[in-house]
């Protein structure tokens, strides 16, 4: 049976134009006008008039908490949330219990991701055993087992020698090192950005140099080893300046920014509210502007949500005691479209480049990030014209820890398909 998506506004090859998309056997068979004439029988038609038809979004940074912390999220609920947000490929971080730090555990996670995920869930292997920055993993074995890349996300690799050896091993395999950059000796128990707002709230601050100092170290190591070094969730002006300089010197570096760091600064934190506690923290107004500018000038390559669900108890009370993290899969596209595209700061084409094309391209995902005949039919349909309210009751994630609940936005997901199969469809109310 074939599926025809009719009359949509298709994003392809950097432009948006009206076209039909014909899908057969999980693949895109044809793109063009009046394709209903191509298949006469057993054709399912989907009317996408006045809707955006885009390549499925790609998120290289999610936390699915499974195994070990399934009261926060599972592979299934996390992937449902991703589909709700228009994502068809996501990459799951290894801060799990047990940590996927052996070939056997990586293979098991890859199998579970395929079984339980409704979207394509790629698995990071850890850089060190137990995420402890000490003993390196079996890089060769973990690549063979299916590891997408290597990361100790949740904690930076604290010793330069360990990171250097990791980079050498990853480079030899043409694999990426994906780094949560944070020097633990510079944290001093902080819970939000160090600055005036932290002082006003009487809360301990996190210095921006805890991030940028480790980026500086790692960029020198990346230059020495030639590894593809990817920086997670950059958040400071100094960090992007370092990445910009490194790119000028032809160091093989890419980086991502999270939606919340584009949308909010520390001055937007209304009080001692754990829903505004994330790591890295919301930074200053100048930092936020630097992130926006760095997307526009190409220093920042992509947007990744850092989807980090927690239980209600873990995000209630005092910021000093609450867990770090914010959800993002279900709000990212709509919030960014509304706040940046509708206001003329970004174009729609740019937003899709950062949320789909670039992450797929930079990480060598040949079957993601573009709609072309012969490729997998991984796509999302968005309604850009109808305003709606982000409601807690609509979340498919177990986590509701986001300050964006209640926002009026545009860009609602109508339908998400993976390999030509519907994995999310909006219910009309």
Curated annotation (Swiss-Prot):
Give the active-site positions.
Answer: 306
The cofactors named for this UniProt entry are: Zn(2+)
Membrane-spanning intervals of the chain: none
Q: Which GO terms describe its molecular function?
A: allantoinase activity; dihydroorotase activity; zinc ion binding
CDD domains listed in its UniProt record: DHOase_IIa
Give the record's keywords alphabetically. Hydrolase, Metal-binding, Pyrimidine biosynthesis, Zinc
Query: Signal peptide position in this chain?
Result: none
* Pathway the protein acts in: Pyrimidine metabolism; UMP biosynthesis via de novo pathway; (S)-dihydroorotate from bicarbonate: step 3/3
EC number per UniProt: 3.5.2.3
Q: Which residues participate in Zn(2+) 2 binding?
A: 153, 180, 233
Q: What does the protein in this record do?
A: Catalyzes the reversible cyclization of carbamoyl aspartate to dihydroorotate.
Name listed for the protein in its UniProt record: Dihydroorotase
Q: What is the lineage of its organism?
A: Bacteria, Bacillati, Bacillota, Bacilli, Lactobacillales
């Amino acid at each position: 049976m074939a599926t025809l998506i009719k009359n949509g506004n298709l994003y392809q090859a950097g432009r948006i134009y009206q076209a039909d998309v014909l899908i057969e056997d999980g693949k895109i068979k044809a793109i063009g006008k009046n394709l209903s004439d191509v298949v006469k029988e057993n054709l399912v038609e989907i009317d996408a008039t006045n809707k955006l038809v885009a390549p499925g979004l790609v998120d290289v940074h999610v936390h699915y908490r499974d195994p070990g912390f399934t009261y926060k999220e599972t592979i299934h609920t996390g992937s449902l949330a991703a589909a709700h947000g228009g994502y068809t490929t996501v990459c799951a971080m290894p801060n799990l219990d047990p940590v996927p730090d052996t070939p056997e555990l990586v293979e098991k996670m890859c199998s579970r991701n395929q079984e339980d995920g409704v979207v394509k869930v790629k698995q990071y292997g850890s850089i060190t055993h137990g995420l402890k920055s000490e003993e390196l993993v079996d890089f060769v074995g973990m690549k063979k087992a299916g590891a997408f890349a290597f990361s100790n996300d949740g904690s930076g690799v604290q010793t330069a020698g360990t990171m250097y050896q990791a980079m050498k091993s990853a480079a030899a395999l043409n694999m990426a090192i994906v780094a949560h950059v944070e020097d633990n000796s510079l944290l001093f128990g902080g819970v939000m950005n160090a600055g005036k707002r932290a002082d006003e709230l009487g809360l301990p601050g996190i210095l921006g140099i805890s991030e940028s100092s480790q980026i500086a170290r790692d960029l020198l190591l990346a230059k020495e080893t030639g590894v593809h070094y990817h920086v997670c969730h950059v958040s400071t002006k100094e960090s992007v300046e370092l990445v910009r300089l490194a790119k000028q010197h032809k160091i093989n570096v890419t980086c991502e920014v999270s939606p919340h760091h584009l949308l909010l600064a520390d001055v937007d934190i209304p009080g001692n509210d754990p829903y505004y506690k994330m790591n890295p923290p919301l930074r200053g107004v100048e930092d936020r502007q630097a992130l926006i500018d760095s997307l526009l000038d190409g220093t920042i390559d992509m947007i990744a949500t850092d989807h980090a669900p927690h239980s209600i108890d873990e995000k209630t009370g005092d910021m000093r005691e609450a867990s770090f993290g914010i959800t993002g899969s279900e709000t990212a596209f709509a919030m960014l479209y509304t706040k940046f595209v509708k206001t003329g700061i970004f174009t729609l084409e740019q937003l899709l480049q950062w949320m789909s094309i670039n992450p797929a391209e930079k990480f060598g995902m040949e079957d993601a990030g573009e709609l072309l005949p012969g490729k997998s039919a991984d796509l999302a349909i968005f309604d850009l014209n109808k305003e709606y309210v982000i409601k807690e009751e609509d979340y498919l994630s177990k986590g509701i820890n986001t300050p964006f609940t209640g926002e009026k936005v545009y860009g609602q997901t109508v339908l998400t398909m993976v390999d030509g199969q519907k994995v999310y469809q909006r219910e009309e109310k």
